[in-house]
Design a protein with these regions (language model features):
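Conserved beta-strand termini and adjacent loop/short-helix elements that scaffold enzyme active sites
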Residues: 78-80, 133, 212-215
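Conserved donor-nucleotide/metal-binding helix-loop-beta segment in metal-dependent transferases, i.e.
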Residues: 113-142
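Ligand/cofactor pocket segment of small-molecule handling proteins
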Residues: 138, 142, 147, 151-153, ...
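Short, conserved catalytic or adaptor-binding loops enriched in Gly and charged residues
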Residues: 66-72, 148, 202-205
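Catalytic-core segments of class I nucleotidyltransferases/pyrophosphorylases
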Residues: 120, 124, 153-251
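A structural signal for short hydrophobic beta-strand segments in well-ordered beta-sheet cores
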Residues: 25, 146-148, 211
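Conserved N-terminal catalytic core of the sugar/cofactor nucleotidyltransferase
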Residues: 2-5, 13-16, 26-27, 31-106, ...
């Protein structure tokens, strides 16, 4: 399995913090934001990772992560021009992925809890075409929201609805196979001009989507309140001895 980290976008919800920098460089407790999704992929046993960059401070992102050796990873990079959506960014990785299953993690997602190695293996060896992790939140209107049937199965996803049909959202961890790239090519831009990940996931419904609930703690860090929440969660994990120290990176 290979990995993707999406680290583009304009991050207007974090202005003025992100006027002159990429949000994924902002600190969350004792390390840059982007270290968290990198650690999520490393915890699955993934070693080959592509970072999709865009927006400001691309050079600084590359300088920070370098070739990934200090994470035990082999990192490569691809540039996304403009805010064209998560599904569009995934489509840029077609040549990198080749014939392998892959996991895409959004660069502003912080997962603190058990690693995902077992879930990654279950997807890779299972029958599903795609997968994501569900998580219950208090403000689902900020996200894509899962609609469930009476048996608790996901039947649809809706992007940032005004009236959410549940409090369960697909967090920014997506398991996919190479066949996803053909589906990405069939998507049409949403009203905000993006290829939406919820539209891609809906192509696998009903019945072809792996969608377990995440049992750890999760937050995105795309707004000032959620950035603060992420730091608080990381501090709690650190004080409990559950947050490993950030990897040491040689400074030249």
């Amino acid at each position: 399995m290979k990995g993707l980290v999406l680290a583009g976008g304009t991050a207007t919800r974090l202005f003025p913090l992100t006027i002159v920098t990429n949000k994924h460089l902002l600190p969350i407790y004792d390390r840059p934001m982007i270290y968290y999704p990198i650690a999520t992929l490393a915890g699955m046993g993934i070693r080959e990772v592509m970072v999709i960059v865009g927006g400001k401070s691309v050079g600084e992102v590359v300088e920070l992560l370098a070739d990934g050796e200090h994470f035990g990873l082999d990192l490569t990079y691809r540039y996304q021009r403009g805010a064209l959506g998560i599904a569009h960014a995934i489509g840029l990785a077609r040549d990198f992925v080749g014939d392998d299953a892959f996991c895409c993690v959004l660069g502003d997602n912080v997962l603190l809890g058990p690693d995902l190695a077992d879930l990654a293996q279950k997807f890779e060896t299972g029958p599903w075409g795609a997968g994501t992790l569900l998580y219950e939140v208090a403000d689902p209107e900020r996200f894509g929201v899962a609609e469930l049937d009476a048996a608790g199965n996901v039947v649809a996803f809706e992007e940032k609805p005004a009236h959410p049909k549940s409090n369960l959202i697909p967090i920014g961890v997506y398991f996919l196979r190479p066949s996803a790239f053909d589906l990405v090519n069939q998507l049409v831009p949403s009203g905000r001009g993006e290829l939406e990940i919820t539209d891609l996931l809906n192509r696998y419904l009903p019945g072809n989507l792996f969608a377990p609930c995440y049992e750890g703690q999760w937050t995105d860090a795309g707004t000032v309140p959620s950035l603060l929440r992420a730091a608080e969660l990381a501090e709690q994990q650190s004080q409990a001895g559950a947050l490993p120290s950030p990897p040491e990176r040689p400074v030249s």
